[in-house]
């Protein structure tokens, strides 16, 4: 990916509790940063209470490894009153804090108020249920993207919208039309053949121009 000129990476982290899989990717994050410090890493924390443990928290660990953006799920915070604590912690490390919106969550006043309160400029819309691969894309994501884009324009906010999961060569074009900035989907490009892998990336780049 890096050899092909890609500079932005979405990295999943799982603790086996919030999702059933354990995804420990500390070495991967370190490696990407070591290759080029300008590589931009989005860390997707699918972990329970990622702010707990202070110096041993997931937020602390991945901040120190060089993550540029760290996003959390509000459902992963046992005490909803601590959502603010987690976002503040991310920002205290000089990182961009983000919120992941799950398939069954809507763009509501609670979300918009949190965005304004903590000056959140990155929201990720899940296109599939969290923690599961190979799922069908939920088209409600497109309407959520429109709602967020209208909100951002009204508030004159430079909000970056990302879609994660369920993407294919057709719906990525729709996502772009509906105001999405970033697309995270390994299934779009993955291949055991390096030639095919490069071809897939080039096709996507061409389609999104």
Q: What are the language-model segments listed below?
A:
Residues 22-44, 88-102, 140-161, 202-209:
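Alpha-helix-loop-beta-strand connector modules within alpha/beta enzyme cores
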Residues 17-50, 54-55, 172-188:
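A short alpha/beta connector and helix-capping loop motif
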Residues 1, 49-64, 104-118, 166-183:
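Catalytic cores of alpha/beta
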Residues 100-141, 147:
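Histidine/lysine/aspartate-rich catalytic loop segments that bind and position anionic ligands
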């Amino acid at each position: 990916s890096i050899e092909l000129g890609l500079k932005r990476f979405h990295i999943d982290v799982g603790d086996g509790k919030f999702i059933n899989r354990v995804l420990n990717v500390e070495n991967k994050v370190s490696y990407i940063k070591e290759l080029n410090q300008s590589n931009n890493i989005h860390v997707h924390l699918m972990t329970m209470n990622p702010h707990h443990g202070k110096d041993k928290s997931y937020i602390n660990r991945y901040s120190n490894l060089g993550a540029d953006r760290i996003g959390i799920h509000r459902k992963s915070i046992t005490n909803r009153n601590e959502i603010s604590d987690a976002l503040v912690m991310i920002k205290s490390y000089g990182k961009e804090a983000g919120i992941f919106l799950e398939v069954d969550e809507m763009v509501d006043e609670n979300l918009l108020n949190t965005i304004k309160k903590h000056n959140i400029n990155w929201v990720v819309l899940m296109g599939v249920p969290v923690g599961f691969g190979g799922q069908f894309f939920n088209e409600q994501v497109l309407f959520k993207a429109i709602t967020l884009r209208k909100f951002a324009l009204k508030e004159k906010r430079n909000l970056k919208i990302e879609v994660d999961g369920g993407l294919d060569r057709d719906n990525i074009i729709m996502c772009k039309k509906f105001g999405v900035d970033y697309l995270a989907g390994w299934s779009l490009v993955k291949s055991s053949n390096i030639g095919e892998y490069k071809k897939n990336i080039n096709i996507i780049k061409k389609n999104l121009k």
